[in-house]
Amino acid sequence: MRKVLLGFVIILAAVALLAQFILPAIATSAIKAKVVSRLSTDDVDVSMQSDPNVLLAIGDIDKMNIVVHRATIGAVYLRDLTLQGKKVHIDMASFLEDQAVSVSHAEQLSLRGVIGENELRRVLEEKISRLDNVEVRITPDGITATANTKLFGRKADIVLTGKVVEDEGTLFIKMTSLNIKNALIGRAKLDDMFGNIELLKAEKMPMGLKITNIVHQDGEVIIEAERRPDK
């Protein structure tokens, strides 16, 4: 009888251990792996809490905090990204089927991303192939980029100014001026030479987030986004 009772206790302890620690750890690890893949980075810290802890295994998260360094979303390179949430439910059926982190409900979910000068320089170099020696400066007034390019077979110096803006959920660099100085043709102002530079389409924002605020400050652009509270 004692052996049976002992065996029963061991089974209960194993089930409790599985429910309280092992399954939640597996769920957290799986979500972290997806974040790493989605944001093209391996520098991720994921913290998720629920009471009881076993709720994490079915996607019910009381508190969530994800911190990412050197992330990529769309054509945006982010120096830092923080995602915070409360009462978040992840659709685990969808996650298990196609590894998509789909949020079906959230009481609160917000994102804060930081784009530094080096990150914007990379965007300009990739989006405008004709630019060399690109340097970017960010101030509260906006973005100033200097570079060299070829114009009519001769090297020219350019100065581009603009701002990171949002329109109907799409994030892009809106050019405000483009000045080109060339020894052969003198000084030209060609505002429409390159046009606006798209960074992120609205549908590429993760977890139903919508951009709510963009702030330019010395050395960086802050992007803030939120998911509207679900009823």
Describe the function of each predicted region:
Residues 41-119, 126-134, 138-151:
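N-terminal beta-strand/beta-hairpin edge segment
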Residues 5-21:
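Hydrophobic membrane-insertion alpha-helices, especially the h-region
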Residues 1-2:
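N-terminal positive-inside, membrane-proximal cytosolic segments immediately preceding the first
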Residues 185-231:
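Extracytoplasmic/luminal low-complexity segments enriched in Pro/Gly and acidic/polar residues
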Residues 113-195:
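Soluble extracytoplasmic domains of inner/organellar membrane proteins
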